Amino acid sequence: MLTRLVLSAHLSSTTSPPWTHAAISWELDNVLMPSPRIWPQVTPTGRSASVRSEGNTSSLWNFSAGQDVHAIVTRTCESVLSSAVYTHGCGCVRSATNITCQSSGQQRQAARQEEENSICKAHDSREGRLGYPLSAHQPGSGGPN
């Protein structure tokens, strides 16, 4: 069973090309889930896009500037596929000279890194199943929006 959680992020860009090279990173809002740097899979949905892994912290997206991005993020916790609840996305528009983040929110990532060693055990013992608190970004029993 795989719980699918969808987060919308909005990219804005002042660059002239219609398509921008952007890196999306996420901030967790569920203490049972690990920090973004060990979430290897980010899947764009509902849009025409290309995505590839960029280390373990983010994925590179090719989207039209100003376009809404919908993502499903999953990882394997030992033998269990799990998903995280996200409340914040930072869209970084890469240009030839700089990277401009439209929003911030990565301050809590460092604090969560020390939780990673016990994150699977905490998930198994406290949740006991693939169930997560509802948030504004978690769809109902249906598919992604």
From Swiss-Prot:
Glycan-linked positions: 98
Alphabetized UniProt keyword annotations: Glycoprotein, Secreted, Signal
Subcellular location: Secreted
Residue numbers spanned by region Disordered: 103-145
Keyword Acetylation in annotation: no
Chief location bin: secreted
GO cellular component, one term: extracellular region
UniProt cross-references to Pfam families, sorted A to Z: DUF5570 (PF17731)
Position of the signal peptide: 1-22
The keyword Isomerase appears for this protein: no
Protein name: Uncharacterized protein KCNJ5-AS1
Organism this protein belongs to: Homo sapiens
